[in-house]
Amino acid sequence: MDAVLLEHFPGGLDAFPSSYFDEDDFFTDQSSRDPLEDGDELLADEQAEVEFLSHQLHEYCYRDGACLLLQPAPPAAPLALAPPSSGGLGEPDDGGGGGYCCETGAPPGGFPYSPGSPPSCLAYPCAGAAVLSPGARLRGLSGAAAAAARRRRRVRSEAELQQLRQAANVRERRRMQSINDAFEGLRSHIPTLPYEKRLSKVDTLRLAIGYINFLSELVQADLPLRGGGAGGCGGPGGGGRLGGDSPGSQAQKVIICHRGTRSPSPSDPDYGLPPLAGHSLSWTDEKQLKEQNIIRTAKVWTPEDPRKLNSKSSFNNIENEPPFEFVS
């Protein structure tokens, strides 16, 4: 057996580390363990196994003075070696694990270098993923640097920050100016009291809601009385025809309360207030007005005075009270 082994392994068995062969287990008298321990002759499968080992050792090419030997095969084939890793030189498999790295400088009695055989190689356990080639190490460092660069925010200069603040201030001023212009337009369409200071936005919205509700109720109440003809809407101080000329139509008039038409009285809640400038929306049948005297009644919407917390919008029926500027 020694002759056969030396024929395939010129360097002898000394080149194998203790992790592959144990001297006590290899040379034993118990024939029940391994047929290689007999020493008389090798069986056919044992000879094939030795040839496979020799072929595998020569298959591991030695590059840059270092090579990678994988872990030994399962116990069923203790002397077989797995094929080389696809990870490249000095790189462990993706699955991790402790392979065997080998380097030059085998102990005396190792494999002599020859053109047909690899240089001497000393196997030792690798540290798994910790054993990386310089190329893999460089790739890892470059990836970490790129990730850090992506996370790093660009530091703006003081001039850039000042420009950003100025742009934000300009946008805010324009936004507030547009809101103020919209409220001014709303105030111009709502009959309000002559107040010594401009109405706030809350008061403007409250008056607008009350005025819109009043006009909506008035239109709903006038639907059964209106004719089929189209009418118009009077502007400030004027009136327009909204109903048809049917004989059964009733004269309707909308009067925005005009203060000061009645004699002032100290008991009047509106005493001392200047007259309210408003507009009148009126429509009636002109023929009926010419033929007979008609008593006109109308709903009156009085705007809420912001100075009076307890006052609310009121709806009154005023009889024979002329509007602010009545146009018959």
Curated annotation (Swiss-Prot):
<dbReference type="GO" id="GO:0000981">
    <property type="term" value="F:DNA-binding transcription factor activity, RNA polymerase II-specific"/>
</dbReference>
<dbReference type="GO" id="GO:0061074">
    <property type="term" value="P:regulation of neural retina development"/>
</dbReference>
<keyword id="KW-0217">Developmental protein</keyword>
<comment type="function">
    <text>Transcription factor implicated in the cell fate determination in various organs. Binds to the E-box consensus sequence 5'-CANNTG-3'. Plays a role in early and late pancreas development and differentiation. Important for determining whether cells allocated to the pancreatic buds continue towards pancreatic organogenesis or revert back to duodenal fates. May be involved in the maintenance of exocrine pancreas-specific gene expression including ELA1 and amylase. Required for the formation of pancreatic acinar and ductal cells. Plays an important role in cerebellar development.</text>
</comment>
<dbReference type="GO" id="GO:1990837">
    <property type="term" value="F:sequence-specific double-stranded DNA binding"/>
</dbReference>
<keyword id="KW-0219">Diabetes mellitus</keyword>
<dbReference type="GO" id="GO:0005634">
    <property type="term" value="C:nucleus"/>
</dbReference>
<dbReference type="GO" id="GO:0046983">
    <property type="term" value="F:protein dimerization activity"/>
</dbReference>
<keyword id="KW-0963">Cytoplasm</keyword>
<protein>
    <recommendedName>
        <fullName>Pancreas transcription factor 1 subunit alpha</fullName>
    </recommendedName>
</protein>
<feature type="region of interest" description="Disordered">
    <location>
        <begin position="305"/>
        <end position="328"/>
    </location>
</feature>
<dbReference type="GO" id="GO:0003677">
    <property type="term" value="F:DNA binding"/>
</dbReference>
<dbReference type="GO" id="GO:0006366">
    <property type="term" value="P:transcription by RNA polymerase II"/>
</dbReference>
<dbReference type="GO" id="GO:0048384">
    <property type="term" value="P:retinoic acid receptor signaling pathway"/>
</dbReference>
<dbReference type="InterPro" id="IPR050283">
    <property type="entry name" value="E-box_TF_Regulators"/>
</dbReference>
<dbReference type="GO" id="GO:0000977">
    <property type="term" value="F:RNA polymerase II transcription regulatory region sequence-specific DNA binding"/>
</dbReference>
<dbReference type="GO" id="GO:0000785">
    <property type="term" value="C:chromatin"/>
</dbReference>
<dbReference type="GO" id="GO:0021549">
    <property type="term" value="P:cerebellum development"/>
</dbReference>
<dbReference type="GO" id="GO:0003682">
    <property type="term" value="F:chromatin binding"/>
</dbReference>
<dbReference type="InterPro" id="IPR011598">
    <property type="entry name" value="bHLH_dom"/>
</dbReference>
<dbReference type="GO" id="GO:0035881">
    <property type="term" value="P:amacrine cell differentiation"/>
</dbReference>
<feature type="region of interest" description="Disordered">
    <location>
        <begin position="259"/>
        <end position="278"/>
    </location>
</feature>
<keyword id="KW-0524">Neurogenesis</keyword>
<dbReference type="Pfam" id="PF00010">
    <property type="entry name" value="HLH"/>
</dbReference>
<dbReference type="GO" id="GO:0070888">
    <property type="term" value="F:E-box binding"/>
</dbReference>
<dbReference type="GO" id="GO:0006355">
    <property type="term" value="P:regulation of DNA-templated transcription"/>
</dbReference>
<keyword id="KW-0221">Differentiation</keyword>
<keyword id="KW-0804">Transcription</keyword>
<keyword id="KW-0805">Transcription regulation</keyword>
<keyword id="KW-0539">Nucleus</keyword>
<keyword id="KW-0238">DNA-binding</keyword>
<dbReference type="GO" id="GO:0031017">
    <property type="term" value="P:exocrine pancreas development"/>
</dbReference>
<dbReference type="GO" id="GO:0032502">
    <property type="term" value="P:developmental process"/>
</dbReference>
<dbReference type="GO" id="GO:0048663">
    <property type="term" value="P:neuron fate commitment"/>
</dbReference>
<comment type="subunit">
    <text>Component of the pancreas transcription factor 1 complex (PTF1) which is composed of TCF3/p75, TCF12/p64 and PTF1A/p48. TCF3 is responsible for the nuclear import of the p48/p64 complex. Interacts with TCF3 and RBPSUH/RBP-Jkappa.</text>
</comment>
<dbReference type="GO" id="GO:0005667">
    <property type="term" value="C:transcription regulator complex"/>
</dbReference>
<dbReference type="GO" id="GO:0001228">
    <property type="term" value="F:DNA-binding transcription activator activity, RNA polymerase II-specific"/>
</dbReference>
<dbReference type="GO" id="GO:0005737">
    <property type="term" value="C:cytoplasm"/>
</dbReference>
<dbReference type="GO" id="GO:0006357">
    <property type="term" value="P:regulation of transcription by RNA polymerase II"/>
</dbReference>
<feature type="domain" description="bHLH">
    <location>
        <begin position="163"/>
        <end position="215"/>
    </location>
</feature>
<dbReference type="InterPro" id="IPR036638">
    <property type="entry name" value="HLH_DNA-bd_sf"/>
</dbReference>
<dbReference type="GO" id="GO:0009888">
    <property type="term" value="P:tissue development"/>
</dbReference>
